[in-house]
Amino acid sequence: MSQPITRENFDEWMIPVYAPAPFIPVRGEGSRLWDQQGKEYIDFAGGIAVNALGHAHPELREALNEQASKFWHTGNGYTNEPVLRLAKKLIDATFADRVFFCNSGAEANEAALKLARKFAHDRYGSHKSGIVAFKNAFHGRTLFTVSAGGQPAYSQDFAPLPADIRHAAYNDINSASALIDDSTCAVIVEPIQGEGGVVPASNAFLQGLRELCNRHNALLIFDEVQTGVGRTGELYAYMHYGVTPDLLTTAKALGGGFPVGALLATEECARVMTVGTHGTTYGGNPLASAVAGKVLELINTPEMLNGVKQRHDWFVERLNTINHRYGLFSEVRGLGLLIGCVLNADYAGQAKQISQEAAKAGVMVLIAGGNVVRFAPALNVSEEEVTTGLDRFAAACEHFVSRGSS
């Protein structure tokens, strides 16, 4: 018989780039998880905005099993039916004319930045290579995307970094305007900064970026890795703003827990990419595509998207009630089911401690930096699960406050 797996095994065997919780989940259903000891958790973390339909959704399992019984992989010398169906669904539902599939948000953003550089190179010349991104952004962990991210703590130890990337202040169109010029090939922005604290962009800011990109012949890239696939109550967050990007990246919820990412592009942008200019071995594989196709089918409905907006109200109303009782937060913000509770000055820097108390109470939440407790639950989380989970979160807040901040 094999040895039991324990949390200590992680510290023995894994490269230590993560610091996971002390418990190991072993089973999930809907918005509930159970650990090795059988303890139940209400999951408001959603695998960091990935598990858009909860755990072990029966229709996703069916889609995966059906494709798994046929074939798993061929490589990109061949196409397959599930990926073509998925591409058509994304094209029909968005501004895009073309799609490139990959395995993660970082890969999708890498592809977008490469496409933008090539578009400018082919059309205007090699001098037009500048990328403008934003402070406190997050676009992934490849060297290119982590450099674009605007958080030096993630990139400073990996120098020399890719050149010609500058960072403006988020939600500050004057700061962006000072950096965007005729040497700029692209501007990359999150409609809501997720890792940066759940900070929604203003409408004027995104409209201003669109106008600046038009003026300087730069591509506008929306990183919707975290905000996409129904998370905000629209299929993609750009739909809230009436601002259409040239390129859009999507991943996380697109696979509902199965790894998949995509770059959506207009025909004009896609045309610069020819055979051999980019690729990835597993991109568009039939397993991921079959699952993602079912995810889109289930999420892109008025009932589901309106339900996200309703659930937003459930969360915000109850979180404000909790805050009225314990006085932890200066603000509750976000769109749809991407919600951030900003700690007030008395509790600054202690979001991690609150998330740990929450886990002890049987509810999983996220953080977004040291000052924001983040919620990214399944889009179909039930009212009972919201009530139970927030009861547990309230108990965690009470315990945190009663023991005193430290």
From Swiss-Prot:
Pathway(s) it belongs to: Amino-acid degradation; L-arginine degradation via AST pathway; L-glutamate and succinate from L-arginine: step 3/5
EC number: 2.6.1.81
N6-(pyridoxal phosphate)lysine modification, residue list: K252
One BP term from GO: arginine catabolic process to glutamate
Cofactor(s) this protein requires: pyridoxal 5'-phosphate
Catalytic activity: N(2)-succinyl-L-ornithine + 2-oxoglutarate = N-succinyl-L-glutamate 5-semialdehyde + L-glutamate
Xref: PROSITE patterns: AA_TRANSFER_CLASS_3
Consequences of knocking out this gene: Cells lacking this gene lose the ability to grow on arginine as the nitrogen source. The disruption of this gene also impairs ornithine catabolism.
Top-level taxon of the source organism: Bacteria
Keywords: Aminotransferase, Arginine metabolism, Pyridoxal phosphate, Transferase
Induction details: Its expression is under nitrogen control; a nitrogen-limited medium highly increases succinylornithine transaminase activity.
Any one Gene Ontology molecular-function term assigned to this protein's record: succinylornithine transaminase activity
Function: Catalyzes the transamination of N(2)-succinylornithine and alpha-ketoglutarate into N(2)-succinylglutamate semialdehyde and glutamate. Can also act as an acetylornithine aminotransferase. Is involved in the utilization of arginine as a nitrogen source, via the AST pathway, and also seems to play a role in ornithine catabolism.
NCBIfam families, per database record: arg_catab_astC (TIGR03246), argD (TIGR00707), PRK01278.1 (NF002325), PRK05093.1 (NF003468), PRK12381.1 (NF009047)
Family named by the database record: Belongs to the class-III pyridoxal-phosphate-dependent aminotransferase family. AstC subfamily.
Protein's name according to its UniProt entry: Succinylornithine transaminase
